[in-house]
A protein has these predicted regions:
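Mature, function-bearing regions of proteins
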Residues: 1-315
């Protein structure tokens, strides 16, 4: 950790126009699924293992201030706007940066000023999204992603990084660079109190419910949520690097791997059978349908007799 003045992300230039994630991309196909919320839990765990991020979220995040469910929903809302929001995506990127700018504090570990916009930490937040998704191919699609697919995922991850004003100097440009970057981060990541709290909640199946929920219903809700909480645990721990599991003091058995694989095989079958309306978040569903409708219109336009006239340019 270094001083905030040395580490804060520079303000974006006014003439920078970030590219948006294509709505027919792999990123758009998978980010909008309901299981994204579960898979991304592994990314959040890795973020909580970064010392700067851990201290900042420990002070400022609702995850550790009595509203973890609300924080998760708002985070997913934000990610969906980055990916499917169109012009709103740019506004959301600006909002996220502005929201994090005032989050500064004196580190209890080093005594130095730290910031939510610490470049190393801010890069790590976005990089974990790629790392988890690239490693999650066996769960998401039933096989490892190909090199070409990983290149596409990283391309869109870099687009999101720019959208969120992440400093791009040193940000990985290839899958190999990302792998090397991950190796350099292993020693930085720690079993922070925040990460250990998250892991303990996963192991015990504890859920902090909204104060509006009657306490008499807590036991029933815990029972109803037990299968989902087990899936959450398996997904997060199963996607963590073994070295990170060791730091957090958790193991991973062959039986747990088989159980996780079986569950996601069932989920993939359900996704193939169920209509998209039931498998995607509403914003993702409507954005993808809107894009598909426009693409079909373009295809119909190509059949116009006017395009057969010599000298006519096809748009």
């Amino acid at each position: 950790m270094t001083a905030t003045s040395d580490l804060e992300v520079p303000s974006p230039a006014d003439d920078e126009t970030p590219e948006l994630v294509p709505l027919d991309s792999l990123t758009a196909e998978h980010t909008g699924r309901w299981t994204f919320l579960i898979v991304e839990g592994a990314a959040f765990m890795m973020q909580a293992m970064h010392p700067v991020i851990a201290e900042i979220v420990g002070r400022y995040s609702a995850s550790f201030q009595g509203d973890p469910g609300g924080r998760a929903i708002r985070s997913i809302d934000s990610v969906l706007r980055w990916t499917y929001g169109g012009t709103e995506a740019v506004a959301e990127g600006n909002r996220v940066r502005a929201m994090h700018k005032p989050m500064m504090m004196k580190s209890a570990e080093t005594g130095k000023q730290i910031s939510a916009l610490n470049p190393e930490a801010y890069q790590w937040v976005i990089a974990t999204g790629y790392i988890v998704n690239a490693q999650g191919g066996r769960l998401l699609i039933g096989r490892e992603f190909t090199d070409a697919e990983k290149a596409e995922l990283l391309r869109d991850n870099r687009r999101l990084a720019r959208l969120l004003h992440v400093p791009m100097r040193g940000y990985p440009e290839t899958d190999q660079e990302m792998a090397d970057y991950f190796e350099t981060m292993i020693d930085t990541l720690q079993a922070t109190p925040q990460a250990l709290k998250l892991m303990d909640d996963l192991i015990t199946g504890q859920v902090e419910l909204s104060p509006s929920v009657p306490k008499a219903l807590y036991p029933l809700i815990q029972v109803v949520l037990r299968p989902a909480l087990r899936l959450n645990y398996l997904s997060i721990v199963g996607l963590l690097d073994p070295r990170l599991r060791d730091k957090l003091g958790v193991g991973w058995s062959a039986e747990e791997e088989r159980q996780l694989t079986r569950i996601y095989k069932t989920i993939r079958i359900a996704y193939r059978v169920l209509p998209d309306r039931f498998t995607y978040f509403p914003l993702a569903y409507h954005a993808r349908k809107h894009h598909q409708c426009l693409e079909k219109m373009k295809q119909r336009q190509q059949k116009s007799y006017a395009y057969r006239v010599p000298g006519t340019n096809t748009p």
